[in-house]
Design a protein with these regions (language model features):
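N-terminal intrinsically disordered, cationic/polar leader segments
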Residues: 1-31, 41, 45-107
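Short, conserved glycine- and acidic-residue-centered signature motifs
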Residues: 32-36
């Protein structure tokens, strides 16, 4: 199962961590894993490359974990928050379709 955690300080989403393998299918054929990976990649690219937020990204291949942490403030804060909120809504929808393979939490 893939675990997706969104971190908050008050109303502000400060980052996320996605870890584990969904286990829906074998590597290379796992549509749940592919959908999650695409969401993570799109969010990171939009936040850092388009918005210039300079979020810290850590990848731990040992436990298939990607963590993104926002700086204390961003020039494009509203846009960055919209990207993270959209990612969370997308992953919740995916969880509703494949509840045995993805977990989404706000912490």
């Amino acid at each position: 199962m893939t675990k997706c955690e969104f971190y908050r300080e008050g109303e502000r989403i400060t980052g996320f961590s996605v870890s584990g393998h969904s286990g829906y299918a074998e590597a290379g054929s796992d549509i749940v894993c592919a959908a999650i990976s695409a969401a993570v990649s799109l969010a990171e690219a939009t936040i850092n490359d388009v918005c210039g937020a300079k979020a810290k990204v850590r990848v731990k291949e040992a436990d298939a974990r990607v963590t993104l942490t926002l700086p204390a403030s961003c020039e494009e804060e509203d846009t960055v928050q919209a990207v993270l909120a959209g990612m969370m809504v997308y992953l919740i929808d995916l969880r509703d379709q494949y509840p045995d393979y993805i977990e989404v939490l706000e912490v």
